[in-house]
Structure formats: structure tokens, C-alpha cells
Amino acid sequence: HILFEAGVLKKLLNYYNQNPETKNLLQGPLLYDDLKTISTHFDPKWRGQMYGTWATDERAKDKNAEPFKIEMTGCGVFSCRKDAWVGFNQKFHGFGGEEGYIQEKFRQAGHQAICLPFLRWLHRFGRPNGPTYPLTLWNKIKNYFIGHTELNLDVQPIYEHFSEWASKDQLDRLFKESVGEPQKKLWSKTSRELMSKAK
């Protein structure tokens, strides 16, 4: 359900040829159905049972613009060298939790999430026949707990956001099922600090 603009994959291979040692996570702008409007990244905000809201960096409106760092974005398209792949948590199940998580995992490994303005992709959001993969609220919450705990991020925002759909006892139970006894996991460094310090 992903389509690329003509020539994009050739440009991506050329980028790797020109940057053979890169261990960054490479992503690109989402192109909407009008084939003009783009979104380049997610703002780190909770909304509608998801972490991350689409946003646009004006620099990427020029396909030939220089690559730039992003904090997080959707995972419809991402690329890296095989030896640079940091992996998803094997406890993830169903839909949700990967966006923001995988970019942060690259940063904690000393690398970056990069937007390549030419790497444009069109995503079919509509599902006329419904999703063909597990899509449950409980899976989403568990995945967020698993990912945040693995990366030593604070889980309190998960409790706060999902309190609209689940009780404190239900969330504690999901936390325990996912990673152990309920507790707040605090992290001493913010994502933006790592973005500025990582190579």
C-alpha cells in the first residue's frame, strides 16, 4: 500500500553509494493524494490513541534540499544498512508503538533519524475491507509500555493519554503483563538532547 515517485529508489541507492558508512535511519516525506502536499515528520504529541501527529518542515518542499534530522515520523517507509539495523522489540504484537520508538532507538545507539526530501512516498490510508492485521487498543498500550520501558522513557504520558479509554487498574495490569510490576520509568536525557549530541 506504498507507492514511490519515479526515480526515488535510484536516488536512495545513490545516497548510499555517496554515504557508504552511514548508520542512520533514513526516511522521507509522506505525499498526499493531491501529489503536492507533504508531511515530513511527527510532532511528539499524543492524539487519538497514537503518539505523534503529522507535521511539515518547509525545507522538504524542495526535493533537492539537503537531508535533515527529524525526531520521529510514520513508518510507512524507512531504510538503513543491514549492519546498522537496531531492531524492533520482539515483544511487540499487533499494531502501534513503533513510531517514535525506532527513531529513538537509533539515537540511543549513537545515530540519527534523517529525512531525505527526495524520498517521497504515497500511502493508501483507506481500508475499504478493514485492516488485515490485529488492531486492538490493548495491543497498542502494551507496545507503548514495552517500547518506552526498553528505551528507559517515562511511561506516565501513556497512563495520562490512555486514561480516557482504560482505568488505572487496567493500565497497571497491561503494564505488568508487558514488562513487569507497575512503576514510572524515568529517563534523564530528553530526545532532543540526544538529537543534538549524536553523530
Residue ranges and their predicted role:
Residues 1-3, 92:
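The conserved acidic donor/metal-binding loop of glycosyltransferases
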Residues 3-48:
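Conserved donor NDP-sugar-binding/catalytic core segment of glycosyltransferases
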Residues 4-7, 27-28, 88, 115-117, ...:
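Intrinsically disordered, low-complexity regions enriched in proline, serine, glycine
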Residues 36-63, 191, 197-199:
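Extended repeat-based solenoid scaffolds, especially LRR ectodomains
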Residues 56-79:
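A recurrent flexible, glycine/aromatic-enriched loop bordering the glycosyltransferase active site
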Residues 71-75, 87, 133-199:
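Terminal low-complexity segments of carbohydrate-biosynthetic enzymes
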Residues 72-74, 82-115, 119-122:
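Donor nucleotide-sugar recognition loop
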Residues 112, 116-141, 145:
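Catalytic donor/gating beta->alpha subdomain of glycosyltransferases that bind UDP-sugars
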